[in-house]
Structures are given as C-alpha cells and as structure tokens.
C-alpha cells in the first residue's frame, strides 16, 4: 500500500458516523461485492481482509443484539427505585483494550460495588450487559469502517477510493458558505473515465493514413544583388548535353571550347 492510500485509510476513522451504511446494509453490500471473488477463489489482499471483517461483524453484531434484547427484558424485573449505574462506573472501550478478557467481568463488578454495595442482582446483570454491548458497538464501528474501505477498493479501485476520501475530507473541512451544497461522490469521480471509454464514436470507411505521402518542400528565396533568386533553381541539376552540341561558354573565358569532333 502506497503512502497516499495508507493516509486515506487512516482518515476513514475521522469521517462522520452517519457517512457509513448501517451494519445490515453494509454487510449485504460487501457480500454482493465479494461474491464474484469468492466464486473464483481469489486471494487478493482486499478480498481476504474484507471477508475476515464480514465474518467478524456478523458474529459481533448478533452477539451485541442479543445483549441488548436481554438487557431490555431485565428492565421489567429491576426494582423501580433502583438508580442506574452512571457511565463513569462502566468500563469504556479504551479501558477494555488494556484488560484481559477473563478479568473484564471482575473489573466491572468491582466498579458496580464501589458505586452501590447492595446493588440489586438484576440491575447488576443489566449494567454488565449494557457495558459489554457498548464495548462491542465501538469495536463494530471500527470494523465497519475498514470493511467499507476494502470492499469499495474492490468495486472502484484503490486509487479512486483514495482520491475520493481526500476530496470528501476537503469538502467537510471547508466552511459551508464556501463549499458546494452536495458532498462529492465516488460515482461522480469515476464517471468521466467511463464516459470517455464508452462514448467514442466510430467512423465508417477507411481512414486516410498519415505520414505516408512525401511532404512538399517549401521553396525558400534569398536576395542576391537586389534580385530574388530561388534556392531550388540553384540546386537544380544541369541539363544533360546532347552529343555533338557545343558546351556553354563561360562569360569570363575568352577561349573557344575545343570541338568534340577533334
């Protein structure tokens, strides 16, 4: 990956959250783009990475959705006077990356106890599920951005996606009064190339070849003693003499030319 593509991939994390499709739509679009490569058993870089993220997102998404469903079901049995656990007592995504997976439950339980030692058990389970679902959602957000990048590189080409990310970031960073109303689209960037390839008109008949006919030489003139004399006349070969005819006499010579009969 060249340096421009590497920068564009890093800039994907800075794009607005609502720029990317929803998880279900994203996975469906990615599968449609990957289907031809799966049939041919392609081992291209973007195919392998996009396939990995499709599987990862599907598993994480189903698990996260299940956590939310169980947490919502527990709301009915939580005592109505229970105070929800504040966000500051729930483990965040950055903190979870530093904690071993086996110790995640213990760390979260210690925080809930520090908030309220006799916290109801159903409310504790609800707090755990909400914390884990939040961590999964942030991991899914990073994964879906990478999946979007790799399967769009298969659809449009890595160079076009790199160019598109650069233009989009420029548009987003420009004040609204100085930029266009609509954000640039990758279709608009690639459209001129497609039109140029498919819009050429073919002419009927044979085309006259160029460069096969000799060029006509332009006659240059020079001024000699006030008269214009053509260079073509100077370069003209002398006319051949007929046998027996006298040779032309030079104006500077005073002698007769010898007769060819002698």
From Swiss-Prot:
Motif mapping: Bipartite nuclear localization signal: 215-233
Residue span of region RNA binding: 254-260
Region (Disordered): 183-262
Pfam family, one: Hepatitis_core
Cellular component, GO, one term: T=4 icosahedral viral capsid
Residues found modified as Phosphoserine: 232, 245
GO molecular function, one term: RNA binding
Keyword RNA-binding: yes
Annotated InterPro entries: Hepatitis_core, Viral_capsid_core_dom_sf_HBV
A biological process from GO: viral penetration into host nucleus
Coiled-coil ranges (or none): none
Biased composition annotated in UniProt, kind: Basic residues: 215-234, 252-262
Alphabetically ordered keywords of this record: Capsid protein, Cytoplasmic inwards viral transport, DNA-binding, Host cytoplasm, Host-virus interaction, Microtubular inwards viral transport, Phosphoprotein, RNA-binding, T=4 icosahedral capsid protein, Viral penetration into host nucleus, Virion, Virus entry into host cell
Assembly with partners or alone: Homodimerizes, then multimerizes.
Stated family: Belongs to the avihepadnavirus core antigen family.
Function: Self assembles to form an icosahedral capsid. Most capsid appear to be large particles with an icosahedral symmetry of T=4 and consist of 240 copies of capsid protein, though a fraction forms smaller T=3 particles consisting of 180 capsid proteins. Entering capsid are transported along microtubules to the nucleus. Phosphorylation of the capsid is thought to induce exposure of nuclear localization signal in the C-terminal portion of the capsid protein that allows binding to the nuclear pore complex via the importin (karyopherin-) alpha and beta.
Protein name as annotated: Capsid protein
Source organism of the structure: Duck hepatitis B virus (strain Germany/DHBV-3) (DHBV)
Gene name, Swiss-Prot/TrEMBL: C
């Amino acid at each position: 990956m060249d340096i421009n593509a590497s920068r564009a991939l890093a800039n994907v994390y800075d794009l607005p959250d609502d720029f990317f499709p929803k998880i279900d739509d994203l996975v469906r679009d990615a599968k449609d783009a990957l289907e031809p490569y799966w049939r041919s058993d392609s081992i291209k870089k973007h195919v392998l990475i996009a396939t990995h993220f499709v599987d990862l997102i599907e598993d994480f998404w189903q698990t996260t959705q299940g956590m939310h469903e169980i947490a919502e079901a527990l709301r009915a049995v939580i005592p109505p006077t229970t105070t929800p656990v504040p966000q500051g007592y729930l483990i965040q995504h950055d903190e979870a990356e530093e904690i071993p997976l086996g110790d995640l439950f213990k760390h979260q339980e210690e925080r809930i106890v520090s908030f309220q030692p006799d916290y109801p058990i159903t409310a504790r389970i609800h707090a755990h599920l909400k914390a884990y679902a939040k961590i999964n959602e942030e991991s899914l957000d990073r994964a879906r951005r990478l999946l979007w990048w790799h399967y769009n590189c298969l659809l449009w080409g890595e160079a076009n996606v790199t160019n598109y990310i650069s233009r989009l970031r420029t548009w987003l960073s420009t004040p609204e009064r100085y930029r266009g109303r609509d954000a640039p689209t990758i279709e608009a960037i690639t459209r001129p190339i497609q039109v140029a390839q498919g819009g050429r008109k073919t002419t009927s008949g044979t085309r006259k070849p160029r460069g096969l006919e000799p060029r006509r030489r332009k006659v240059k003139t020079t001024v000699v003693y006030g008269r214009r004399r053509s260079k073509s006349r100077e370069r003209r070969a002398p006319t051949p003499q007929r046998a027996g005819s006298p040779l032309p006499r030079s104006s500077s010579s005073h002698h007769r030319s010898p007769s060819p009969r002698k």
